[in-house]
Design a protein with these regions (language model features):
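Active-site nucleophile and cofactor-binding loops and adjacent substrate-binding regions
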Residues: 7, 77-79, 156-157
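Glycine-rich phosphate/nucleotide-binding loop
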Residues: 16-117
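Glycine-rich phosphate/diphosphate-binding loop of Rossmann-like nucleotide-binding domains
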Residues: 1-11
Length: 171
């Protein structure tokens, strides 16, 4: 294996990693820049709600969601569980359980292809059509479903539990 070290400033690196990601296999950086980089890259594939995370060292590995905790959403059954599900998929692959990992990946892909989406995934699939809410007022599930249908026709808004069930159903 050949390791090429390329030192660059953070703003230029963010541009390069988004424009030519295939030029980078390993990134070593400080925590703050790592947070910016991982969030920017997560946005390219669906956001932090779907991006898995792993910290792998010699003989030890930790797999976790890439986002922090969101105490304000605790117990509300509406946060995208994709990040932790895909972190589990990476863990299964790491320990050599490739067949189980393949089932998890198939389930996540199937749920998204069938448009069984948490609201954050609907925004990503809709692309630039997404309009940010004008206020921070709370919306009913029916209002959110109506907006979801406008963003992604044929989509079904699912809860945390609903997305997990959709993953299982699509395995």
């Amino acid at each position: 294996h050949v390791l090429t070290v390329k030192d660059c400033i953070a703003d230029n690196f963010l541009q390069q990693i988004i424009l030519v990601p295939e030029q980078h296999e390993v990134i070593a950086t400080l925590n703050l820049n790592g947070d910016y980089i991982s969030d920017a890259l997560a946005a390219q594939v669906g956001g932090i709600g779907i991006a898995p995370g792993a910290n792998i060292g010699k003989g030890i590995a930790v797999f976790e969601a890439t986002h922090g905790s969101a105490e304000s959403f605790a117990g509300k059954n509406r946060v995208n569980p994709g990040s932790i599900i895909l972190s589990g998929e990476m863990m299964l692959r790491y320990i050599g359980w490739d067949e189980a990992a393949d089932f998890v990946l198939k389930g996540v892909k199937g749920a998204i292809q069938k448009k069984q989406l948490t609201f954050d995934l609907a925004r990503v699939r809709a692309g630039r059509k997404f309009i940010r809410p004008k206020s921070k007022e709370k919306h009913t599930a029916e209002e959110i479903q109506k907006e979801l249908m406008a963003l992604v026709p044929g989509a079904t808004l699912v809860s945390t539990e609903g997305f997990g069930d959709a993953v299982i159903d699509n395995m």
